[in-house]
Design a protein with these regions (language model features):
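A solvent-exposed beta-alpha-beta segment
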Residues: 36-150, 218-225, 232-235, 239-244, ...
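Strand-loop microenvironment adjacent to phosphate/nucleotide-handling motifs in alpha/beta enzyme folds
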Residues: 173, 178-182, 338-539
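Conserved Rossmann-fold NAD(P)-dependent oxidoreductase catalytic core, especially the SDR/UDP-sugar
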Residues: 150, 270, 274-334, 338
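NAD(P)-cofactor binding segment of oxidoreductase domains
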Residues: 126-140, 212-219, 262, 282-309
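Flexible, Lys/Arg-rich cytosolic regulatory linkers and terminal tails that connect or flank
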Residues: 93, 98-99, 125-187, 193, ...
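N-terminal Rossmann NAD(P)H-binding glycine-rich loop of SDR-like oxidoreductase domains
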Residues: 188-204
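Aromatic-rich membrane-interfacial microdomains
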Residues: 1-52, 56
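Conserved Rossmann-fold cofactor-binding substructure of NAD(P)-dependent oxidoreductases
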Residues: 247-266
Length: 539
């Protein structure tokens, strides 16, 4: 019996061994793979940048799903201002109060905070961004809802905080009736079409469906660039607007007249100008010839060609100018005011003043971004300098709307919001790049801010208005200013003398004439023209 039992058991054991071996093999292989995967996953996770997602709404959840598809970021938590979802778990990620961000940074070594709040107001974004400045983390954001391609969020759509976010200014929707009044079904001409403002005017004008859009530009490359861009836009949108690229100088009245008459121009936006204060200060005669007499040539050509509306793009630097550029733009305004007051004037002249536009050539923002990327220092001319800022699209839209409101000789002033202290802007840009300001209190910081001294003709503060007679219009961001003016009979004498002084390179007479005209010119520096200085060295 014992032998029989043993025999049966051994037979069963022999039959079970393959099964046992198979199970051991499966468990061994599976567990080894799981261990290896865990090791590799942990290794990959350590290589990824730990991030916090600010905003646990639909956009934040989409961003989390997008992050999981790439090996760049490792999301460790949501934070959200909504107390109803704090202390909950969404997609295996806990939602924290924003006050707990310091703890999360310390515990998980968070290096970046990703903003996923596209529907927030500009004021709300500004408040959140200012709170995040306290942490040494780079802040990135997804675009606003209107800028998202197909409404989809991806890691590639993340971008750095822009100065627009720092300004926290809510846009005012453009009024269609004002946008189209001088453009729709009309022939429109933009001088300086390849510049920062000129090119944006062209983009906005194209959307308002003129019959023709004339791009008038001195720079061949700038003209080529904007013409190419607009044609690509037209192809994508199926637009039938005729775009006409024209090379020419605004100082050539014959060229201007022939263009305006040949195309029967209805509306002119005059954006061509020399605008950089030091450059005009160093090249006084060219600045006056272009800004004053170039404007006059355009305006007179418009009158001769029967143009209905002429809008001058002016500047806040024309108010109590301390430099030649500002004085030259104020002289340009005086020219239009005088022409507008002429008897039986059929062309409606107006001018629109505003401050600095974000992203324009020479703007502090791209300069600061480049300096931060290069490790500093950020160079600033004065620690107390302030400026007004506006986005280029908003400025262009307001210029078009203001032009439609003009009755003749109007000086419009755009509401630029609050002035910005440039040193504060520089500090914010450094901190939001995940770096620290290097100064006496923080000698081991990353980026130093270096004060270089005011440039020739540069103001500490800019003004937008002259006098107190400021009147509101029907648009909340457009006002009118009451200005001193001269009738054409008096102004033409000054202009004649000014032209003679330019032709004779008489810098002293130029300055005296700018002082004699009602420009409010109070020069901050002596004569800075480089050729004049070189000649005086030789003497």
């Amino acid at each position: 019996m014992f032998c029989l039992t043993t025999l049966v058991f051994e037979q069963k054991l022999h039959l079970a061994l393959p099964i046992v071996y198979f199970l051991v093999l499966v468990v061994g292989v599976t567990s080894s793979r799981m261990i290896l995967r865990a090791i590799l996953t942990d290794h990959h996770r350590k290589q990824m940048t730990p991030v916090i997602i600010y905003g646990a709404g639909q956009s934040g959840r989409q961003l989390l799903e997008a992050i999981k598809q790439v090996n760049e970021y490792s999301a460790i938590a949501f934070v959200d201002d909504n107390p109803k979802i704090q202390r909950t778990v969404i997609y295996d990620l806990a939602v924290y109060n924003p006050n707990e961000i310091p703890m999360l940074i310390s515990r998980y070594g968070v290096r970046k905070i990703l903003l996923a709040i596209p529907s927030s107001t500009p004021e709300e974004r500004k408040d959140i961004i200012r709170r995040l400045e306290a942490y040494k983390c780079e802040v990135l954001t997804i675009p606003g809802m209107k800028d998202l391609v197909d409404g989809k969020i991806s890691v590639s759509s993340l971008k750095k905080i822009s100065v627009v976010d720092l300004l926290g200014r809510a846009p005012v929707a453009p009024r269609p009736e004002l946008m189209s009044a001088d453009i729709s079904d009309k022939v429109v001409m933009v001088t300086g079409a390849g510049g920062s403002i000129g090119s944006e005017l062209c983009r906005q004008i194209l959307n308002c469906r003129p019959t023709k859009l004339l791009l008038f530009e001195l720079s061949e490359f700038a003209l080529y660039s904007i013409d190419k861009e607009l044609r690509e836009t037209q192809a994508a949108q199926g637009s039938q607007v005729e775009v006409v690229p024209l090379l020419g100088s605004v100082q050539n009245k014959e060229r201007l007249s022939s263009v305006m008459k040949a195309y029967h121009v209805d509306t002119v936006y005059h954006a061509a100008a020399y605008k950089h204060v030091p450059m005009v200060e160093f090249n006084t005669i060219e600045g006056i010839q272009n800004n004053v007499f170039g404007t006059l040539c355009c305006a007179q050509a418009a009158v001769d060609a029967g143009v209905s509306t002429f809008v001058l793009i002016s500047t806040d630097k024309a108010v109590r100018p301390t430099n030649t550029m500002g004085a030259s733009k104020r002289m340009a305004e005086l020219c239009l005011q005088a022409l507008a007051a002429e008897p039986e004037q059929k062309t409606r002249f107006c001018m629109v003043r505003f401050g600095n536009v974000l992203g324009s050539s020479g703007s502090v923002v791209p300069v600061f971004e480049k300096q931060i990327a290069e490790g500093g220092p950020i160079t600033l001319t004065h620690q107390d300098i302030t400026r007004y800022f506006m986005t280029i699209p908003e400025a262009a839209q307001l210029v078009i709307q203001a032009g439609a409101m003009g009755k003749g000789g109007d000086v419009f002033v755009l509401d630029m919001g609050e002035s910005v202290k440039i040193i504060d802007l520089a500090r914010q840009m450094i901190v939001l790049s995940g770096l620290k300001v290097k100064d006496e209190q923080h000698p081991h910081g990353d980026i130093e801010i270096k004060i270089t001294g005011l440039r020739p003709g540069e103001k500490l503060y800019e003004e937008l208005l002259i006098g107190d007679e400021v009147q509101k219009t029907t648009h909340p961001r457009i006002m009118t200013a009451s200005e001193v003016m001269l009738p054409w009979t008096q102004l033409s004498d000054i202009l004649s003398e000014l032209q003679t002084a330019c032709l004779q390179s008489d810098q002293n007479s130029l300055r005296q004439l700018l002082l004699r005209a009602p420009t409010g010119f109070v020069p901050k520096d002596g004569i800075c023209d480089l050729v004049w200085q070189q000649n005086n060295k030789a003497v």
